[in-house]
């Protein structure tokens, strides 16, 4: 049921889709997740990104692992933006999944392959 409510799209044309960018140095993985990279997302009490979650699903693993969650509680400061950086260690390949929640337009997802 939840699966049918999660939206996705091309982040270059849709401001709600989380953008996932990562760097790997040995086992240390640095992942930046942002919403509104190409088209800025509003950050007002009436329309904002409330949170971002990052998951890692290792190849051969049964379930994805929650790497972290960031909540954005200030929705009136023009200097804040929905962006978070996560660090974790793994030697495995797999998929990175990001979820973001817009208080008006709901859940949005994106995924990238971690090599």
From Swiss-Prot:
Q: Give the EC number.
A: 1.15.1.2
Which amino acid positions bind Fe cation, per UniProt?
14, 16, 41, 47, 102, 105
Q: Secretion signal: which residues? A: none
Catalysis performed (reactions): reduced [rubredoxin] + superoxide + 2 H(+) = oxidized [rubredoxin] + H2O2
Task: Please provide the record's keywords in A-Z order.
Answer: Electron transport, Iron, Metal-binding, Oxidoreductase, Transport
Q: Which InterPro entries match?
A: Desulfoferrodoxin_Fe-bd_dom, Desulfoferrodoxin_Fe-bd_dom_sf, Desulfoferrodoxin_SOR
State the needed cofactors, names only: Fe cation
Q: What class of enzyme is it?
A: oxidoreductase
One GO molecular-function annotation for this sequence? iron ion binding
Report the Pfam families cross-referenced here: Desulfoferrodox
What is annotated about its quaternary structure and interactions?
Homotetramer.
Report the family membership: Belongs to the desulfoferrodoxin family.
The task this protein performs is described as:
Uses electrons from reduced NADP, by way of rubredoxin and an oxidoreductase, to catalyze the reduction of superoxide to hydrogen peroxide.
Full protein name:
Superoxide reductase
Q: What is the lineage of its organism?
A: Archaea, Methanobacteriati, Methanobacteriota, Thermococci, Thermococcales
